[in-house]
Amino acid sequence: MSVKHTTRYSLDNQLSVLPDDTGLPRHAEHRFRERTPHDRDVGLLEAYQRGNDIPHPSVAYLSGKHPSPDRARVYRHGDQWGVVFLICTDHRPETGVAEVVRTVVAIRQY
């Protein structure tokens, strides 16, 4: 039997914990690396810390089948690139965190 490996919205119990006690699963780390320039001079932790929560996180949803995030944290690296950290409540007591970064989405610039 073969197993298809995917990181799509996987919330495993192997979380890094950000300074504000938000869990960061491997999926979100992978998406940050995938969706930001490879030669970026700002890493994930710095982008998260320098980012700002938006007042109405419900505007940052992915599609109709996924619920809106409880929090959305935006980091813009000038006009070059930017990301949105989509943060949801984590109801799993074994993780030890109240919130988790569900995924990281690139900001498209037009």
Q: How would you describe each model-predicted region?
A:
Residues M1-Y110:
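Ribonuclease/tRNase effector modules and their secretory precursors
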